């Protein structure tokens, strides 16, 4: 795993992926990702209907995390082609004590191990570079794929929680 701490937006590189800080040019990609049925079902409907909505979401929700905490969601792209396939990163939620690893991969790229590869790299980066002692994961109770992924990452079910904006109940893994 290569870590780049310069102004270059590339943060992590794995065998098959590059994770970088998103830019405003990623608005179209974010619009596509956040309107997939799986994202809406298991994460939330963020109400993004236009590229302008997605650009606003980047400015108001994604970019401020970098300014406040030094980390956030990264654009996940295929190393060979630069094709964006998802997002993965670290989130500090007001309602959780620990930092949360989050991930979402476009449906057409699911089942290839990309989410695990990205999330494992992000968690390693969080622990070794950012000095985070605890990283947790949160998912919907019926999201079996994410539950298996969190378990594969070494996290275990801790308890049920309520996260505002994420449905009535979520599962916390730690």
Predicted regions mapped to residue ranges:
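Acyl-donor (CoA/ACP) binding surface of acyl/acetyltransferases
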Residues: 1-42, 75-174
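Conserved GNAT-fold acetyl-CoA-binding loop/helix
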Residues: 38-60
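PAS/LOV-family and closely related PAS-like sensory domains
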Residues: 52, 64-67, 156
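A short helix-loop-beta-strand connector motif used in the catalytic cores of GNAT acetyltransferases and
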Residues: 62-75
């Amino acid at each position: 795993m290569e870590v780049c701490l310069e102004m270059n937006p590339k943060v992590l590189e794995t065998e098959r992926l590059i994770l970088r800080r998103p830019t405003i040019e990623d608005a179209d990609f974010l619009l596509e990702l956040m309107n997939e049925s799986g994202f809406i079902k298991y994460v939330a409907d963020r109400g993004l209907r236009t590229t302008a909505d997605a650009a606003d979401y980047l400015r108001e929700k994604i970019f401020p995390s970098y300014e406040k905490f030094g980390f956030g969601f990264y654009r996940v792209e295929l190393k060979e082609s630069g094709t964006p396939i998802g997002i993965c990163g670290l989130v500090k939620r007001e309602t959780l004590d620990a930092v949360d690893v989050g991930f979402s991969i476009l449906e057409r790229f699911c089942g290839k191990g990309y989410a695990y590869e990205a999330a494992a790299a992000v968690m390693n980066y969080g622990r070794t570079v950012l000095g985070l002692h605890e990283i947790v994961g949160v998912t919907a109770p019926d999201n079996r794929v994410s539950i298996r992924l969190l378990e594969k990452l070494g996290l275990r079910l801790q308890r049920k929680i309520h996260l505002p904006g994420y449905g009535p109940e979520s599962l916390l893994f730690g």
